[in-house]
């Protein structure tokens, strides 16, 4: 009789094999914020001095950004959670397409390059395909600062006219509180001549983190975290040592992992104020939260459905919409999840349905009817947060699930299976050769 072929051998793609039904315990460690670290790294372009970043997550996106900066002439060194950068030999203002194609954050280079060199040529970025996510607001802000910008054949070319090659301060009102546009304009404006204001600015913690580090480099930024940011331009910045804030999305993912497995788990380090909307929804679901200065302990209860509407910070974050939906699939009653930020961020619904979830999709709204337990299935994460949601679903499902899409997952989670396994999960990573 031929040997039985395991389910995992049938999947040729790299994937996680998750044995569901195990409770978690102990503490889950949160890495530095990916969305903050990426933009902080590009800030190295603004100064000749050395920038030393600590608490940097070890992710494929971080390496991608390091490669992009190196291609521009930045010296880059990495050692575990520390990244050292120095742009004293900055000689190039056009990152190559093959490096920027898979990383949306690559577009953050345009603001610092304009501010420092007076010109930049940056291909339109890649990343998760969860919607248009245009750069119109970024470009409009750069034009307001005096840059000449054109978009041609998928490449954005920008330059500062005149002999000074220096941007001019301006009052900018964003049509929507875009995080990327706010950060791009902020980095461009710190070396501009005069004062700039950004109204309807994004208030996300990552914007606050950027402003704090820029100030440590000698910038004069005030109001970050509110709707109006003021930037008094300076002639030059210097290097600094800086520690990236904890990743609020990873922290939220781990809290949801505790809830979906009905486990008591402590998650740290966390800045609770960065997760207020998520913490409230967990309480509304029936969870108890014990919060201190260093972390949050989740104690599950009899979970029931809640309604979720994604909003810009301080509202419920779009990056936790998919993971929270996974939780709601096994919560009693009906939940309604509405995605207001991106128009194509429901790709996880079909995969959750493969695991037995009862979900009706109506445009960007999902109606979830809770069931007692999900069933294991082979599923595919088509974007970063969808992949995370499926990992959580696998933890709670009966049987052994296989989750592929690790190229997405590894962009945003630092050794997620290692951390979950240390807390009691049973996850194997399969990386087929050839």
From Swiss-Prot:
UniProt superkingdom: Bacteria
Catalytic reaction list: phosphoenolpyruvate + UDP-N-acetyl-alpha-D-glucosamine = UDP-N-acetyl-3-O-(1-carboxyvinyl)-alpha-D-glucosamine + phosphate
Keyword Magnesium: no
GO molecular function: UDP-N-acetylglucosamine 1-carboxyvinyltransferase activity
Catalytic residues of the enzyme: 128 (proton donor)
Any one GO CC term of the record: cytoplasm
Annotated positions of the 2-(S-cysteinyl)pyruvic acid O-phosphothioketal modification: 128
Keyword Cell wall biogenesis/degradation: yes
Protein family according to the UniProt entry: Belongs to the EPSP synthase family. MurA subfamily.
Protein name: UDP-N-acetylglucosamine 1-carboxyvinyltransferase
This protein's encoding gene: murA
């Amino acid at each position: 009789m031929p040997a039985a072929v395991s389910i995992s051998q049938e999947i040729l793609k790299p994937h996680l094999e998750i044995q569901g039904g195990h409770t978690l315990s102990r503490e889950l460690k949160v890495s530095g914020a990916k969305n903050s670290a990426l933009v902080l790294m590009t800030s190295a372009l603004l100064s000749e001095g050395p920038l030393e970043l600590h608490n940097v997550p070890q992710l494929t996106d971080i390496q991608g950004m390091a490669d992009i900066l190196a291609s521009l002439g930045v010296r880059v060194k990495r050692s575990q959670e520390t990244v050292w950068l120095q742009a004293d030999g900055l000689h190039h203002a056009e990152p190559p397409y093959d490096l920027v194609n898979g990383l949306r954050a690559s577009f953050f280079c345009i603001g610092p390059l304009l501010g420092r060199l007076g010109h930049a040529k940056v291909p339109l970025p890649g990343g998760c395909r969860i919607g248009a996510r245009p750069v119109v607001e970024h470009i409009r802000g750069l034009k307001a600062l005096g840059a000449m910008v054109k978009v041609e054949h998928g490449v954005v070319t920008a330059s500062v006219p005149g002999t000074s090659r220096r941007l001019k301060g301006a009052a900018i009102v964003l049509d929507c509180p875009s995080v990327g546009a706010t950060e791009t304009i902020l980095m461009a404006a710190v070396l501009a001549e005069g004062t700039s204001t950004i109204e309807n600015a994004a208030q996300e913690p990552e914007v606050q983190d950027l402003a704090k580090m820029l100030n440590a480099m000698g910038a004069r930024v005030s109001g970050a975290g509110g709707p109006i940011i003021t930037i008094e331009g300076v002639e030059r910045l210097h290097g600094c040592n800086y520690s990236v804030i904890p990743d609020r999305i990873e922290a939220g993912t781990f809290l949801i992992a505790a809830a979906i497995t009905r486990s008591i788990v402590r998650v740290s380090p966390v800045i609770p104020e960065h997760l207020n909307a998520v913490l409230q929804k967990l309480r509304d679901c029936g969870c108890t939260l014990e919060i201190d200065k260093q972390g949050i302990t989740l104690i599950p209860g009899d979970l029931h459905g809640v309604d979720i509407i994604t909003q810009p910070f301080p509202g419920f974050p779009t990056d936790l919409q998919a993971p929270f939906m996974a939780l709601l699939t096994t919560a009693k009653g009906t939940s309604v999840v509405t995605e207001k930020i991106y128009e194509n961020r429901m790709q996880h619904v079909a995969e959750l349905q493969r695991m037995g979830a009862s979900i009706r999709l109506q445009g960007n709204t999902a109606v979830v009817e809770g069931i007692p337990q999900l069933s294991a299935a082979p599923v595919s994460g088509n974007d970063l947060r969808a992949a995370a949601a499926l990992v959580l679903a696998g933890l709670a499902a009966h049987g052994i699930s296989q989750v592929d899409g690790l190229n997405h997952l590894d962009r945003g989670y630092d050794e997620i299976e290692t951390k979950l396994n240390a807390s009691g999960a049973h996850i194997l990573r399969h990386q087929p050769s050839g």
